[in-house]
Design a protein with these regions (language model features):
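Catalytic core of pol beta-like nucleotidyltransferases
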Residues: 1-25, 33-38, 52-136
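Short hydrophobic/aromatic beta-strand micro-patches
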Residues: 44-48
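Histidine-centered divalent-metal-coordination microenvironment in nucleic-acid enzymes
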Residues: 40-42
Length: 136
């Protein structure tokens, strides 16, 4: 798929997600961004309010909207709600993804900062644990 076609799809995804008042910010990430071939289109969204029990249904609902708007099979759309995502996943999205939009820059900056600080702290502990496990 050409870069131009990818940009058209990305713009359509942005349009669909931005129209949803619940979505505070959105990212696209994964192989769709830079790889010549890709398996699916990954997008991460942060909602102003969602219960943990509603995450799967929310991801499916938004995937369907994007699938219809982009005229792509739903199995090509992989939406992840980021509200309860583990830190290492968030760190990867923020580091390697591309922001589509943010309706609240202050909140986005706060989450990125917290995720980065946690990653740094966890890196130290992981390194210390590894040193204890690996014989000299």
């Amino acid at each position: 798929m050409s870069q131009s076609d990818r940009q058209k799809i990305t713009n359509k995804i942005k349009e669909v997600l931005f129209a949803d008042e619940r979505i505070v910010f959105a990212y696209v990430f994964g192989s769709f961004l830079n790889s010549p071939s890709y398996r699916d289109i990954d997008a991460g969204i942060y909602l102003d309010k969602i219960a943990r029990k509603d995450v799967f249904d929310g991801e499916l609902e938004i995937s369907k909207k994007i699938s219809e708007a982009c005229e792509l099979p739903i199995d090509l759309i992989d939406i992840k709600i980021l509200n309860f995502a583990p830190g290492h996943f968030l760190n990867n999205v923020f580091k390697n993804g591309a922001v589509l939009f943010s309706k609240n820059e202050k909140l986005l900056s706060k989450i990125i900062e917290e995720t980065s600080l946690n990653a740094i702290a966890n890196e130290y502990f992981a390194y210390q644990s590894l040193k204890e496990l690996v014989p000299k």
